[in-house]
Amino acid sequence: MTTGFLQKIFGSRNQRLVKQYQKTVAAINALEPQIEQLTDDQLRGKTGEFRQRVASGESLDKLLPEAFAVCREASKRVLKMRHFDVQLIGGMVLHYGKIGEMRTGEGKTLVATLPVYLNALSGRGVHVVTVNDYLAQRDAEWMARLYNFLGLSVGINLSQMDHAAKQEAYAADITYGTNNEFGFDYLRDNMVYETDARVQRALNFAVVDEVDSILIDEARTPLIISGQAEDHTELYVRMNALPPLLERQIGEEKADGTGVEKPGDYTLDEKGRQVFLTESGHEKAERLLSEWGLIGEGESLYAPQNITLMHHVYAALRAHTLFFKDQHYVVQNGEVVIVDEFTGRLMSGRRWSDGLHQAVEAKEHVKIQSENQTLASITFQNYFRMYAKLSGMTGTADTEAYEFNEIYGLETVVIPTNRPPKRIDKQDQIYKTAKERYDAVIRDIRDCYERGQPVLVGTTSIENSELLSHLLKQAGLPHEVLNAKQHAREAEIVAEAGRPKRITIATNMAGRGTDIVLGGNAEKQASFLELDETLPEDEKRRRIQKLHDEWQALHDQVKAAGGLHIIGTERHESRRIDNQLRGRAGRQGDPGSSRFYLSLEDPLLRIFAGDRVRAIMERLKMPEGEAIEAGIVSRSIESAQRKVEARNFDIRKQLLEYDDVSNDQRKVIYQQRNELLEANDITETIGAMRQSVIADIVHQFVPAGSIEEQWDVPELEEVLRNEWQLDLAIQEMINESNSISADEILEAVEAAADEAYEAKVELVGRESFSAFERSIMLQTLDRSWREHLAALDHLRQGIHLRGYAQKNPKQEYKREAFELFAAMLDAVKLEVTRVVMNVQIQSPEQLEQAAEQLEEQGSHLENVEFRHAEFAEAAAAAPVAAEAATAAMIGDAMSHGSSQAAAANMSADNVPKVGRNDPCPCGSGKKYKQCHGKIV
């Protein structure tokens, strides 16, 4: 109450910010008469002047009024569009690193030109991020005219572009591209073996279009670069026969044994999208798998030799019970293609992880692709937080303002509309069944059609859009369907959606990014005519003129009928998605209306609010076909949506806290890689590693500060001779000396190692040997990092169980992840030193050839995929198996004695049972607890 009272006096934070920006708007407007007097060349020359001032130390903030005034004037001359005052405010919001909420049709693309121009003056690059290639190319080509007029270069970063084209795109002052491509380029840049193979510059400033879609909806889907793993095709096919033989249990068993309405073999958690076998389900699955010869008779699924089968059992169950055709995926050209649950678009090239995609392929009887193994990954949360300055714009951000601030440190500012909105949002209507709901939707559509009012109907899945299309055909109502299956015609369908009597069905926000103009989009229709090569030029001009003449009459007709009417056939889990659908109507002060039609069979109502609403309907004795239309019900639904949003936010926050651990380690590894790539000579680095490794070996047998009786000199001599090619008579040194310390022995071994190293360098030359060392170092670091990623994933999968031991799983994860990381770095030092010390060199040419083969092996990975993965599933992506050394001499180096071969094959999964103080089975000579036991 006090807060509301104070807000009335002082205004909200949003109102105060807008008021503050309006003062700067007045300063920009005051400059307009002066800027208008400039010739085109003088206006263009302002860019050079601004750049000099920035180089001299003037801040971009101080330059803002002049730069915005110049950009606005250039837009008037080139694009024939003048920025409104509210668009100037939007530009300031973006420049100051905030998120701007702008209603649909308020000109977000034009707003972005202001901060993009201003920040490009620094010469450090600006990235404009969009959700798909079509929008990136459209906006870049449209706005390039403005930027080029002002003397700035524009690049487009698209998927499938070659390396040279990408480097050129990133070198431009302004780079347009998709969130996926920017993220993948970052990962690829950290897998290269030459500095000139990188494409990105330092991440300076990004303007993210549809920021809610990218930073929130896709925050749970990390970008993953992966290769193909072992083929389990036959196993997926055989497991596909299991789910149909199992029955679902209805109800959860309570502590007193009640609660189960119908016993079964598995239970479903629809909220968490998980499936769990019951006790009887385990027994039945084990019996069936035993009959099929997949496990031994009487064996448990949890026996060590069968534990991987559980992964296949659950993948098959999830594929059959939680993922459905034309809702979560479509089958197209013999492939299973994922449908984005937020946008309804097909996500070609993306695959679910953890074997789920292969299980769905087995279910649909299409060709099963191989499983994937992770080479590199990053979340959008951690990628975009690396920019020095980040901003974004969307039509619906205010509902997620807390998350933007909490996760990204971004403040949300609601930007006023240029004209007051006239859209009427009607009360939801709730029916008992889906059939009653669809009958009401058809009645509303028919009413609009007869009055000449265009209708946009939003559905939550392809399946529902096709069901509604079938019902409209039966009702004799002509319509267009806009879903992932009609992706190619999307722009054309949206351009026509505002014409009189036009009925358009769209899945969620398909067509987002393109305005629905009342009367139809004459400009868009004209552009289609321009592309028609069969028409003569005279005929084109005549038709385009006719289009413009007809448009005004159609526009007035639609306005008189009430503007665009939005019908929602189901509430989404997020209020923001519902608001996006509503936001398609009432653009730039046009009239419009919206209404949602719901049924108690909808997932959101059934899971979260069904019982309460059903009780209200039964109390009111609602007859069939009658709807509830009351504020209390709408509030109940909104409350359910808030619960889901809060739950999803908690999930994203938890995932980020876990991912931050691997992100900190990723930064260290990538920094080390970059230092290796950029260093002219890594002799000092290799020398420090060699000293560290030699010290560890000597201290195993001759501990520091110990007496001679505690030394194991014969074993030390043997290890140095067999594993490190150092033939030292240490026992003779001891016998000849009256008193020799452990430190003196260490110095003698280090001197011998340095001498052997220098002899190899002298044979081939410092430059050649340094190049070889760099290749070995990069290859080992990359391989170890991939294995470490898999180790972290396995750790994360079981870490929640620590809660049962009264331990904090997050703290335990951080502690153990750090220990794994330290062990990995030690393993890298050991491996690199071992190869360098053991390598047999005959000639410089042989060394160069080996280095080239190593680099080629690391940079040309076969069957590489660039994809998203559902985060919970991404954790199960397997590591890349250790690559075999490519050069013969490295093969020789790695085969000196059995211990090297054994060590190369030691991992947490195949270490035999051994006492902590026993010698490690890898043959290193260390105690198990100080060697591979440390990693396990």
From Swiss-Prot:
May bind 1 zinc ion per subunit. Its cofactor is Zn(2+). Gene3D superfamilies: Helical scaffold and wing domains of SecA, P-loop containing nucleotide triphosphate hydrolases, SecA, preprotein cross-linking domain. It is found in: Cell inner membrane; Cytoplasm. Its main location: membrane. One of its GO terms (biological process) is intracellular protein transmembrane transport. GO terms for cellular component: cell envelope Sec protein transport complex; cytosol; plasma membrane. Transmembrane segments: none annotated. ATP binds at residues 87, 105-109, 515. One of its GO terms (molecular function) is protein-exporting ATPase activity. Monomer and homodimer. Part of the essential Sec protein translocation apparatus which comprises SecA, SecYEG and auxiliary proteins SecDF-YajC and YidC. This is Protein translocase subunit SecA. It comes from Paraburkholderia xenovorans (strain LB400).
